[in-house]
Amino acid sequence: MQFHSSSALITPFKKDLSVDEAAYESLIKRQILQGMDACVPVGTTGESATLTHKEHMRCIEIAIETCKNTKTPSNSCMKVLAGVGSNATSESLSLAKFAQKIGADAILCVSPYYNRPTQQGLFEHYKTIAQSVEIPVMLYDVPSRTGVSIEVPTALKLFREVPNIKAIKEASGSLKRVTELHYYEKDFKIFSGEDSLNHSIMFSGGCGVISVTGNLMPNLISQMVNCALKQKYQQALEIQNKLFHLHQALFVETNPIPIKMAMHLAGLIENPSYRLPLVAPSKETIQLLEKTLQQYEVIA
């Protein structure tokens, strides 16, 4: 996985709640031009749980087409880490095969949500999906959403026994897990999935981030990651601290509710539309977002 900085892309909707493909393409181009290494379509932030199978595949397709046709400032192509998560292994497997077929560089697969599988069930789930493709696979541990954690021994076993499982997105909130994973397997790539811990995870052995805030501030997220990779940790910390209030504001309600509203307020998407059961943020949250964006000089 030859990338380090990436954003968990939002999925913009039109007023009729269909996917706004033109806006989606525009957002991806902005990521490319502002220095991100990769984009992550249809993950949690992309509201994958309320997309149809056809919409899910189309979003992956748009991301791949846009990255292929838009060069980065260094004249390369931004990588696509395609989200293929589902609580049905068969559906994740189908999405993984599709993503590989149309040119995804790697896939991100969240643990099955609601089912609450055992550790053996998680092992078989990930093994089955990974063995169906040849491209790299990133595990995704976010127990606050899935109801179950990929325990450290299970994650290590998957890395050791399944050749194309190369990385894990850590959104557990536990730095202890990060240090354990890095201690036992230095080549197991760890990506931060929690913006408030980006610097801490990078300092503890992480090699990159998958950021929600990066939708709005891709340039600063990219700069922070690049500083950390060069072991310029003080500079990275300064950027992390600069983003502190924005990170806080973007998670006062369930993700991606605040980030979509922030993107709308910043003029980056026309409609801050959500599919039920997600709803628009409260008046208080909108006021907080406006104040925060003014603080960062995103809006006047």
Swiss-Prot record:
PROSITE patterns: DHDPS_2 (PS00666). It comes from the Bacteria. Pathway: Amino-acid biosynthesis; L-lysine biosynthesis via DAP pathway; (S)-tetrahydrodipicolinate from L-aspartate: step 3/4. It is found in: Cytoplasm. It holds the Pfam family DHDPS. One of its GO terms (biological process) is lysine biosynthetic process via diaminopimelate. InterPro entries: Aldolase_TIM, DapA, DapA-like, Schiff_base-form_aldolases_AS. The record marks T44, Y114 as: Part of a proton relay during catalysis. GO terms for cellular component: cytosol. Homotetramer; dimer of dimers. This is 4-hydroxy-tetrahydrodipicolinate synthase. It comes from Helicobacter pylori (strain HPAG1). The gene is dapA.
